[in-house]
Amino acid sequence: MYKTIIMPVDVFEMELSDKAVRHAEFLAQDDGVIHLLHVLPGSASLSLHRFAADVRRFEEHLQHEAEERLQTMVSHFTIDPSRIKQHVRFGSVRDEVNELAEELGADVVVIGSRNPSISTHLLGSNASSVIRHANLPVLVVR
C-alpha cells in the first residue's frame, strides 16, 4: 500500500502510540517501512554560554532515553523489525514531521490522538498541528 510511513510517537505516553501501531502495520503491508519519530523540545537556552554544556548533557540524556524507549516500542509491532526505523529529533513535532517526510519522500503520516479536551481545543495538539501543516496525507487514530 504505502512504501514510507512516518509515525510520530511520544515515548513517554506509549498508550497513545499503541493505538496507531496496527494501522501503520496495515498500511505498510508487505514491503512498507515505518519510521518512528520522537520529537524532543528544542532548547533556546543554548545561547546562555554558561549553561550550554549542562543543557547539551541534559539533551543527550533525553535523546538516549528516547532511543531506548523507541527500541522497546519496536516489540509492539508484528512486522519484521528491519522494516521499522527510529528517529529522535529536537524541535516542534509539526516541523520535524514535515522535514522528515520531505527527506524520506514519505507517503503518509499515521499519528495517534486522544479525544479532544478543553486544553487541546484552546492550545491545540500535536495531531492537529501536523494535520494543518502537513504536505502529505495524515491518518489520525483515536
UniProtKB/Swiss-Prot annotation:
Family that this chain belongs to: Belongs to the universal stress protein A family.
Record-linked Pfam families: Usp
Protein name listed in UniProt: Universal stress protein G
Entry-linked InterPro entries: Rossmann-like_a/b/a_fold (IPR014729), Universal_stress_UspA (IPR006015), UspA (IPR006016)
Lineage, broadest ranks: Bacteria, Pseudomonadati, Pseudomonadota, Gammaproteobacteria, Enterobacterales
